[in-house]
Amino acid sequence: ENTLYGLMLFLISVIGILNNGFVGNFLTYISAYAFGVFYFVPFLLGIAMGFYLILMKKSYMVKINLVLLGIILIALSCLIGSSLSSTPDSFSTVFTNFHTKISNAVVNDTIFKLRLSDIGGLGGGIVGAFLATLLCSTITSIGTYIVVIVLMLVGLYLTFAKLVLKIIDKSKEAKKKHKE
């Protein structure tokens, strides 16, 4: 059963990342609408999860730990940071401006086909634009830059702290053995 789910998730993700045909264009459009220039990340996660389900043949339980929290903070800081601009939107214009940006990225006379060369103007998608506008309207753009930097640093620390500590411990053990 999980093998079938894994295969379906893998195939849908591959179709989306290839951006061919109506279904591929639609999946890419939805992902770009939500995540902007990071539209490929959900597809890469889908491919990885699909492989995992196919190969392991057992259910995957998401463990909420500090590493996952760090990855989420890094993702949020990337989405917000890529949506910041020199002239922040207000709540009344954020959705209209984003809709204009994504409409400009759509190929003429098509519904969902995006020009991937024009996707850079989308920033972090509607998620990033909303969060950036929320932060800019409450703590100004300078405060938002500070929040993005802090989110990134905390996320990196939470993600890699255990790994760095293990490397330091192993190097200390190696030095002790070398001295003996």
Q: How would you name each of these model-derived features?
A:
Residues 1-179:
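Alpha-helical transmembrane segments used as membrane anchors
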